[in-house]
From Swiss-Prot:
Keywords: Dioxygenase, Metal-binding, Oxidoreductase. A divalent metal cation binds at residues 17, 19, 61, 63. It is an enzyme of class 1 (oxidoreductase). This is Putative quercetin 2,3-dioxygenase Ta0133. Its cofactor is a divalent metal cation. GO terms for molecular function: metal ion binding; quercetin 2,3-dioxygenase activity. Signal peptide: none annotated.
């Protein structure tokens, strides 16, 4: 999670850096973040929007949550008074780690939203809830979706209400409490806590104790070795060494024409 109301904390942003072997999923809650990558793609992530980037074989990018002057009409001239969001790293299977990079921009109005009996709002970025498919499932089907079957669901709860979800069979799941306080199957979790949930297809009952914002994340485990250092996640130490050698030699980016979606 990233978030601050102090401009000095986020004006520096996240300057140019590499990734390989993962997908980065950035969800903007407050403020705006400017993204640009080594393939020439650029855009603004506004509140309620998602950027789902496949680093694959290698990409450089920067994420700059600061005042932005973008385009001839200066459409984004306003200054951000605060900035908050969540970035998730999704490990790619060994067979996909050297895939071509891709960039997916998901607008807020592309994310399906449903309400439960208490009026709690459930936004479905990926996965299926109450037979409603998420934005990623509807707009961006690709091979990795079938392998991992990711769930990315935001829940906005009113105080003293209840909602429920099911952990899909065979999935590992966590729930991040971004704001508020909740009880999950009888256990209390507060702001910035993370609840690790069962992988046995169980139902989860969530009781809110305040206005709460939750992120439910789930996926099928890969059961593969992980070799991780800094922004690069591979399967073996030799692959990591190769990646950092390629960084020094200027050979890191393999594909200059990634998929823009």
């Amino acid at each position: 999670m990233f978030g601050s109301d102090n401009r000095a904390d986020y004006d520096n942003g996240f300057p140019w850096h590499p990734h390989r072997g993962i997908e980065t999923i950035t969800y903007q809650i407050k403020g705006k973040t400017f993204h640009e990558d080594s393939e020439g793609h650029r855009g603004i992530i506004a509140p309620g929007e998602i950027q789902w980037m496949t680093a694959g074989s290698g990409i450089f990018h920067e994420e700059m949550p600061k005042p932005i002057y973008y385009g001839e009409e200066n459409k984004y001239r306003e200054r951000n008074d605060s900035n908050a969001g969540i970035q998730l790293w999704l490990n790619m299977p060994a067979s996909s780690k050297m895939a071509d990079p891709a960039y997916r921009s998901i607008r807020s109005d592309q994310i399906p939203q449903i309400s439960d009996d208490y009026g709690n709002r459930i936004r479905i970025v990926a996965g299926t809830v109450n037979r409603v498919s998420g934005a990623l499932n509807e707009n961006f089907q690709y091979d990795l979706m079938q392998r991992i079957d990711p769930y990315y669901v935001e829940i906005l709860m009113e105080p003293d209400t209840r909602t429920s979800l099911s952990v899909p069979e065979g999935h590992r799941a966590i729930m991040a409490i971004v704001e508020g306080s909740i009880r999950v199957n009888g256990s209390t979790f507060n702001e910035k806590n993370v609840a690790v949930l069962s992988k046995e297809g169980t139902d989860i009952f969530i009781d809110s104790q305040a206005n709460s914002r939750l992120i439910f994340l789930a996926g099928k485990p890969l059961n593969e070795p992980i070799a991780w250092y800094g922004p690069i996640v591979m399967n073996t130490r030799d692959q990591l060494i190769q990646a950092f050698n390629e960084l020094q030699e200027g050979k890191f980016v393999k594909n200059r024409n990634p998929v823009w979606q």
